[in-house]
Amino acid sequence: MIYYIVAGIFPQTIFMGVFTMSRTLGTVVRGVRAPIFREGDDVVAATAETVLTALRENDIAARDGDVVAVTESVVARCQGNYATCQQIAKDVTAKTGGETVGVTFPILSRNRFSLLLRSIAMGVKKVVLVLSYPADEVGNHLVSLDQLDEAGIDPWHDVLNLEQFRAAFGEVVHPFTGVDYVAYYKSIIEDAGAEAEIVFANRVQAVLDYTDTVICCDIHTRKRSKRLLTAAGGRVVLGLDDLLTAPVDGSGYNPQYGLLGSNKADEERVKLFPRDAQEVADAISQRMSEATGKRVEAMVYGDGAFKDPAGKIWELADPVVAPGYTSGLIGTPNELKLKYLADKEFADLTGEALQKAISEKIKAKDAKVSLVGNMVSEGTTPRNLTDLIGSLCDLTSGSGDKGTPIVYIQGYFDNYTNE
């Protein structure tokens, strides 16, 4: 069964006359229902067969430029890419020495970080947890900017201990989860058998006042954090991407991202970001192309790169949107702004004359010449195709019970002139 998202190819602002068109639909995005994937399943074969079956049952013809995307969770599950808290703790002890370790700038997430924090605490004697404030890296707020203003606290200058933070702000409960993450993270550390000290700061170097051994837990700013700590005298400076880069006692692993992109599988295990995602994408593309006779692109996708306007949370908690994708998905869109053409360049035309003029303008566009900075492309921000398509896929498949971990996209690379 397939769910549809359809994007019209012709903007409403251009309908200034009556004329006929041979094609009325543009991009079509379908969420494909799939069987439950299990460890050991052939993710390439299962993905391709599921999509091919859906195409046959729904009388859909594959076309050149179609995209098959499968969520990273399915790939990792089929690989059996899991690790227990004990396995992670053993790696932490081996790489840090197991004494006092700073843990800097983690995101506030039960799914993403609670088991990682527990694992780190199991492997050391003391954790100095440095939380950024007023919010974490992806926008989960401990306190508001207004609260900082009222308390007279400068988050870029002031380093607070737990007592100072509580005196200024009291108990801080996340509006969506109802969790006081400060108390929650402290309890995780202590329940794992380690001593906990909580610090609030936005300069990562602040941790060096407590220890010279640090695990940087930020995601997208981790390289800068490690560079700053090393330059400031950090003796052992690691990131989450430096842990579980190889198997530990039979664990899963990721040589590129380590623990980045992992999330809670059960109370004792995390699922790691998948390995070999590039090879998986290439193999799915090859199988689909051979079966359909068309050039079908493929990608493995994780979190979308969008920001929630209500909660102010950037959803990208994975290190990248797409860890694997075929070569046809490399690059950025190079588009003309149809509204600009209709309202400005061809403002005196209507109907079929307008349609013809815009079509000729698009056909004359040189795909190899970037339109960045040209007025006709204003408003068509050239983001990476993998970020755009991966975000589209994440929104389509959802994160709950839709049962559509595979997404099939048609017409994404078409423009107004394509029949």
Where are these regions (language model features)?
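Conserved mixed alpha/beta catalytic, RNA-binding, or beta-rich assembly cores of soluble enzyme
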Residues: 8-9, 13-64, 73-419
